[in-house]
Amino acid sequence: MAAIEPNPNGKKVIVGMSGGVDSSVSAYLLMQQGYQVEGLFMKNWEEDDTDEYCAAAEDLKDAQAVCDKLGIKLHTVNFAAEYWDNVFEYFLAEYKAGRTPNPDIMCNKEIKFKAFLEFADDILDADYIAMGHYVRRSDASGQSQMLRGVDGNKDQSYFLYTLSHEQIARSLFPVGELEKSEVREIAKEMGLVTHDKKDSTGICFIGERKFTDFLRTFLPAQPGKIETAEGEVIGEHQGLMYHTLGQRKGLGIGGMKNSNDDPWYVVDKDLERNVLVVGQGGKHPRLMSVGFYADQLHWVDRTGPNDGAKITVKTRYRQQDVACTLTYEGDDRIKVIFDEPVAAVTPGQSAVFYDGEVCLGGGIIDSLIRE
């Protein structure tokens, strides 16, 4: 693997040790390259003491075992207050407003590359921080850019679009140069306890709990009607916030007379009437949009693409890039028109833009353009 920096000797890197395989191997690779490496474990959520399985305690144990094996120091820090104020409150407010937020993106913005970086700077005297994210950093243009990870299936640039070039310049991403299978192989060869630990999925503060049960403890749900796009009432929902555009499972409808066998999808949410609108088929006209408006913009280079730029966009993680044209509607609002209509574009989610391998930045989808 190419060295991340020509002369890493003596430079101090604080690695965000999560107790997973990616951060474990990141620490090892940086040591191999001659960096002075220390780990930092973040606790971002205060679990209920009644939780049968305390994930954070298990993760800390694994992080400590890896650091012991590598012979490096592990620090710990509690960011639960910062997480609550900057990530969780936002998450609840968005759901309350009928949108579908992405807390992982907000966590990267406010915690992993802000609170963590400040702590590493002020308390641990770091030259760099490092994370186990599958992205790459390039300094070829004279300014740090973020590129997609080599492993297209694990690329996490979508979740990191809020980073500025200054933050990227202070960050190292060793596993971004590797395939996931290679990362597990390295961990196995090194005898790291995390080599076969399964990847964490879902939202960290929900853990193993059912999403609807978790949300119900914080937000009062208001049941209402489920209607077809033609206005026929065909069922009841337990709360609009439990549903997202394009959702197919968990609607509790089916076997309708006079309907074909195509599955039902959520095609709209009528907030004023508290009605969930459904239609049949993944390409239902109400599910399709030709574009969208977005705001809360973040550009990695702080200026963004040119007005009228022809680039590509992802409107959700793991989606294939879609060719589009971007135009500005003021300082903090853009209009995006797809080359081809796209299904299930969802307000509250992030739209992330690319020029080839380079992640340019993105914004929050505000409203859809249907035709």
From Swiss-Prot:
Q: Where is ATP annotated to bind? A: 16-23, 42, 132
Instruction: List the subcellular locations.
Output: Cytoplasm
Annotated membrane-spanning segments are none
Q: Annotated region Interaction with target base in tRNA: where? A: 102-104
Cite the entry's keywords alphabetically.
ATP-binding, Cytoplasm, Disulfide bond, Nucleotide-binding, RNA-binding, Transferase, tRNA processing, tRNA-binding
Residues of the region (Interaction with tRNA) are 154-156, 316-317
Q: Which GO terms describe its biological process?
A: tRNA wobble position uridine thiolation
Where in the chain are disulfide-linked cysteines found? 107-204
**What family name appears in the similarity comment?**
Belongs to the MnmA/TRMU family.
| Stated name of the protein | tRNA-specific 2-thiouridylase MnmA
Taxonomy of origin reads:
Bacteria, Pseudomonadati, Pseudomonadota, Gammaproteobacteria, Alteromonadales
